A protein has these predicted regions:
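Mixed-charge, glycine-accented linear interaction segment located at domain edges/termini
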Residues: 128-165
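Charge-rich, low-complexity N-terminal segments
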Residues: 1-69
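Phenylalanine-focused residue identity feature
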Residues: 12, 22-25, 48, 73-75, ...
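Short, surface-exposed, charged/polar-biased interaction segments
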Residues: 30-34, 43, 110, 138, ...
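Surface-exposed, low-hydrophobicity interaction/linker segments
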Residues: 59-127
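Generic alpha-helix detector with strongest preference for long hydrophobic helices that associate
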Residues: 3-6, 25, 70, 119, ...
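Context-gated lysine
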Residues: 7-10, 19, 33, 71, ...
Length: 165
């Protein structure tokens, strides 16, 4: 687990809310505080879909919604002349991207052992921070996955031109 302070909040928010930078991540939850509090649970509501629609949903056993699909709604909540007083967005890597990361390391884990590889994005008092986290459904003292995920996020941000400290 690492905590990264984003150096240019405005550029980061553009990547988060306008550009496609984070579109392949899944949304676990979002809390946005403007004139009132808005909370989004990113878990997909199975009852909303017909059986046919459900069958067309792909990947990740469709437990969580893609950020791509919820991003416009979140953006609509905060656009305007005033920034939110605070915002927390929790995302996780897709199963496909998690499998790709696992294939690059020797952690002795499978995606069945992983509840999620998370990034917690927090905006408050004009600053944006990202905190990484891993959740396993088995006990392990091995921190290989944690280290690899932390490195992945640092490289991901750097490749997008998002500076941090």
């Amino acid at each position: 687990m690492i905590s990264l302070r984003i150096k240019n909040t405005k550029t980061f928010m553009s990547h988060l809310l306008v550009k496609d930078t984070f579109d392949n991540f899944l949304l676990s939850e979002a809390d946005i505080k403007t004139s009132c509090s808005h909370s989004i649970d990113g878990q997909i509501n199975r009852a909303f879909y017909s059986d046919e629609e459900w069958e067309t949903l792909e990947g990740d056993a469709r437990r969580y919604e893609l950020w791509l699909n919820q991003k416009p709604f979140c953006f609509s909540l905060i656009k305007g002349s005033k920034v939110p007083s605070s915002m927390k967005i929790v995302m996780l890597m897709s199963t496909k991207d998690t499998e790709a990361l696992l294939s690059q390391i020797e952690a002795g884990l499978s995606t069945d052992n992983i509840n999620g590889l998370f990034i917690n994005i927090r905006y408050q008092e004009g600053h944006a921070d990202i905190i990484t986290g891993t959740s396993l459904n088995i006990f392990s003292l091995d921190k290989t996955l944690d280290t690899a995920f932390d490195s992945y996020i640092k490289k991901f941000l750097a490749d997008k031109g998002l500076e941090f400290e």
